[in-house]
Amino acid sequence: MLIRARKEASERGLIAHVARHDANILKFCSQCGVGKLVYVSSVHAIPEKPKGTEIAETTTFSPELVRGDYAKSKAMATALVLQAAKEGLNASVVFPSGIIGPGDLGKGSITNMLLSFLAGKLPLAVKGGYDVCTACKSNLR
């Protein structure tokens, strides 16, 4: 029970930190007249639908609807950005997946998956993914 409580406290701390950090960035954008904010979220912020369910655009983002600290922090930040957009901030959100590129240094989840696959420890791989440089360039257009 104590370990679970610590994990939940840690998770709450992460979500609170993300909320404060992103709220400050959004406040800065509004106060300084930033022309356009492009927030790079993640597919992990999108709640998973039950297997066999048709995928549709999601408009509700909440830490309670996703699993894992990273997903929860991205869902919270995405909700904050979308709320700021409703209040007048010119903002867009993109949801990349499987990005890999220069500077990864073998610590990212996609790199680890590829290394496991090449070492014969993973019998299959996820199709798709995008180069980080291509993703960044498309977000700026």
Label each PLM-derived region with a short phrase:
Residues 1-20:
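NAD(P)H-binding glycine-rich loop region in Rossmannoid oxidoreductase-like domains
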Residues 7, 61-65, 112-137, 141:
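A conserved pocket-lining segment of Rossmann-fold NAD(P)-dependent short-chain dehydrogenase/reductase
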Residues 13, 20-70, 92:
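Conserved Rossmann-fold NAD(P)-dependent oxidoreductase catalytic core, especially the SDR/UDP-sugar
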Residues 14, 69-73, 131-134:
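The catalytic Tyr-centered alpha-helix of NAD(P)H-dependent dehydrogenases
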Residues 18-25, 73-81:
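Conserved catalytic Lys-bearing alpha helix of Rossmann-like short-chain dehydrogenase/reductases
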Residues 41, 78-102:
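Conserved beta-loop-beta element that borders a ligand/cofactor-binding pocket
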Residues 49-57, 107-116:
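Short, flexible, mixed-charge acidic loops at enzyme active sites
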Residues 94-111, 127:
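Substrate-access "cap/lid" subdomains that shape
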